[in-house]
């Protein structure tokens, strides 16, 4: 059994097709959506979205946060930004984590703690996504 899934960002539609399962990172941990799931709307934290497409092939995306809507015949992910996990660069993600950590440690008079922690959380989620993909698929 499959359900139609759309992943949409501010830049446009990133994915549209039939999937057997959607696994996303919500506020209370990972959530798996299969055909027949009860209707639901929840917010998503930065991290990977894994799609098990029709036929069992997996495709992974990174989202910087957003919302997940589940209806009887449709799953929709509305995200701020979306990248295919294969397009993420581990070295860049590590550098972003280090830069965010440095900014947190070197607070100045005009320091914005909320912005700095948000940058750190997003960079760490990107790095986690890259590492999960590399571990799972040996890339």
From Swiss-Prot:
Gene Ontology molecular function, alphabetical: ATP binding; proton-transporting ATP synthase activity, rotational mechanism
Localization annotation: Cell inner membrane
UniProt keyword annotations, A-Z: ATP synthesis, Cell inner membrane, Cell membrane, CF(1), Hydrogen ion transport, Ion transport, Membrane, Transport
Pfam families documented for this protein: ATP-synt_DE (PF00401), ATP-synt_DE_N (PF02823)
Lyase found in the keyword field: no
Cellular compartments per GO CC: plasma membrane; proton-transporting ATP synthase complex
Membrane topology, record value: Peripheral membrane protein
InterPro entries noted in UniProt: ATP_F1_dsu/esu_C_sf, ATP_synth_F1_dsu/esu, ATP_synth_F1_dsu/esu_N, ATP_synth_F1_esu_C, ATPsynth_dsu/esu_N
Oligomeric and partner information: F-type ATPases have 2 components, CF(1) - the catalytic core - and CF(0) - the membrane proton channel. CF(1) has five subunits: alpha(3), beta(3), gamma(1), delta(1), epsilon(1). CF(0) has three main subunits: a, b and c.
Function field: Produces ATP from ADP in the presence of a proton gradient across the membrane.
Family: Belongs to the ATPase epsilon chain family.
UniProt-recorded name of the protein: ATP synthase epsilon chain
Organism this protein belongs to: Pseudomonas syringae pv. tomato (strain ATCC BAA-871 / DC3000)
Lineage of origin: Bacteria, Pseudomonadati, Pseudomonadota, Gammaproteobacteria, Pseudomonadales
């Amino acid at each position: 059994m499959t359900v139609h899934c759309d992943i949409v960002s501010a830049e446009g539609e990133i994915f549209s097709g039939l999937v057997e399962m959607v696994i996303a990172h919500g506020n209370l941990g990972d959530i798996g959506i299969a055909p027949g799931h009860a209707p639901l709307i929840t917010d998503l934290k930065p991290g990977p979205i894994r799609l098990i497409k029709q036929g069992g092939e997996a495709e992974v995306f990174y989202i910087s946060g957003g919302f997940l809507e589940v209806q009887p015949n449709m799953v929709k992910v509305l995200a701020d930004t979306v990248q295919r996990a294969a397009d993420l660069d581990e070295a860049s993600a590590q550098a972003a984590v280090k830069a965010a950590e440095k900014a947190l440690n070197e607070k100045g008079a005009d320091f914005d703690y909320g912005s700095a922690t948000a940058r750190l959380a997003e960079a760490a989620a990107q790095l986690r996504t890259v590492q999960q993909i590399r571990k799972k698929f040996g890339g």
